[in-house]
Amino acid sequence: MICRTCLRRASGFARPAAAAATRPMVAASSRAAFSTTFSVCTPPAATPAAAAPATSTAEAGLAPVPGAATTEQAKAAISSCPAGTKLNGLNYFKNKADPVALPDEEYPEWLWRCLEVQKKTDDAADADAGDEFSKSKKQRRLAMKRARAQEAKILASGDLEALAPKIPLQKQSVNLPGAVNGGVQDAVLADEKREELRKAMRKERKAKIKESNYLKAM
């Protein structure tokens, strides 16, 4: 028969074991509750399907910019001054600020072709410039260069008669066209020939005046 003292001791040994067995369950439940609340706060992980467009865009080298900005960057800039550049020294109004460069599309189209017209005018002036009897070395060089180019062009065409020395119009001893009983076409032709002779004589007189003034100033 077991005495009361032994029963008390046996019950005292069993209680700490039961408490130790219940403690891990409480800790596990508290951990589960904590992890549940924490998982609600954390954002969901990105799926491969959602990350695929961003990866493909980055690999292609495309930036997520609006379409209008992309088209503006694709256009080639005509002006050397970007929009918003302050143009110093171009203001001719009193008590006004210097102008600011505008975008290229705000300027008229004919503005970008002004230099082309000026270039054509300069080319035409260079073609008429040059005098082999000029006092300027540059003008004589231009005349010789133009004569060599003309001679090479004539030789390439095969017309050797054009290489014969030409007498200036004001030095020629020929009769001007004209008829007393001629028609309108004859009168127009005679007027054109007289105008050509008048221009040639005027050019010669100007050259002589320049030469005489230069000799007087020496």
UniProtKB/Swiss-Prot annotation:
- Write the record's keywords in alphabetical order, separated by commas: Mitochondrion, Ribonucleoprotein, Ribosomal protein, Transit peptide
The record's listing under InterPro entries reads: Ribosomal_mL54
Top-rank taxon, per record: Eukaryota
**What Pfam families does its record include?**
Ribosomal_L37
- Entry GO MF terms: structural constituent of ribosome
State whether keyword Protein biosynthesis applies. no
- Compartment(s): Mitochondrion
Do the record's keywords include Isomerase?
A: no
Q: Name one GO cellular component term.
A: mitochondrial large ribosomal subunit
Q: How does it assemble?
A: Component of the mitochondrial large ribosomal subunit (mt-LSU). Mature N.crassa 74S mitochondrial ribosomes consist of a small (37S) and a large (54S) subunit. The 37S small subunit contains a 16S ribosomal RNA (16S mt-rRNA) and 32 different proteins. The 54S large subunit contains a 23S rRNA (23S mt-rRNA) and 42 different proteins.
Chain's role: Component of the mitochondrial ribosome (mitoribosome), a dedicated translation machinery responsible for the synthesis of mitochondrial genome-encoded proteins, including at least some of the essential transmembrane subunits of the mitochondrial respiratory chain. The mitoribosomes are attached to the mitochondrial inner membrane and translation products are cotranslationally integrated into the membrane.
Name the protein family.
Answer: Belongs to the mitochondrion-specific ribosomal protein mL54 family.
PANTHER family for the chain? 39S RIBOSOMAL PROTEIN L54, MITOCHONDRIAL (PTHR28595), LARGE RIBOSOMAL SUBUNIT PROTEIN ML54 (PTHR28595:SF1)
Name of the protein in question = Large ribosomal subunit protein mL54
What is the source species?
A: Neurospora crassa (strain ATCC 24698 / 74-OR23-1A / CBS 708.71 / DSM 1257 / FGSC 987)
- Where is the organism placed in the taxonomic lineage, from the top? Eukaryota, Fungi, Dikarya, Ascomycota, Pezizomycotina
